[in-house]
Amino acid sequence: MCANASKRIIAYIIDFIFISAILMIVSYFIPKNSNVEFLNKDINDLTEQALNGEITFSSYASEYSNYLSSIDSENVVYNVVSVIIIIIYYVIIPIIFKATLGKYIMKLEITREDTKKLNIFNTFIRSIVVDGLLYSIITIFLVQLVSSKIYLISLIILGFIQFILVITSLFMILYRHDKKGLQDILSKSIVIDKEVKE
C-alpha cells in the first residue's frame, strides 16, 4: 500500500540530515582553497556595506555575482564530489536496497508501478525532482561556462524551479488520493509502506 505522507516526510528529513552530515564530513577531507576564505570575507564585507547603505543594490548584486561565481569555481572539486555522493545515495542505493536510509528507518520501500526491478531511470528521475540532482549538475557546468551575472540569475531561476518541484510534490503527496508525488508519477514508481499489508 502507498505510504502515508507523514512517514515519507520524516524519511525525507532523515535523508536530508544524513546526506548533509556526509557532505560536511567530506568537506573536511577536501583540501581547502585559501582564495575561498578571502572571497567569503569579501562577500561579508560587501553585504555589510550594502546593509549600511554605502553601496547601491545594483553594485551589490554585480559584485556579489562575481564573488559567488569565483567561490563556486574554486569549490568545483567539492561540488563534483557532492554530486557523486548524491548519485550514489539517491540513485544507486535505492536500486540495490529499494530504499534510502530514511525510507529504511521508516519501513518504506521504492518499487516500480509495474513491479519490475527499479532501474537507474526511475531513481534518477526521482532524484531530479526532489533531491536537486539536476540543479547540482547544471550549476557545476554553468559556473565554468557563463558570466558571473548569468550564473547568479541561473542559480536563482534553477533554485526557484527546484523549490516549486519539491513543494508541488509535497502537496501532491499530501492531497492526492493515491499519495503519489510528482517524482512518483514521472519515474513510474511508488513508495510503499512495508508495515501495511494490502
Residue ranges, per PLM feature:
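Short, small/hydrophobic-residue-rich motifs at membrane-helix boundaries and re-entrant hairpins
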Residues: M1-L145, K149, I156-M172, R176-E198
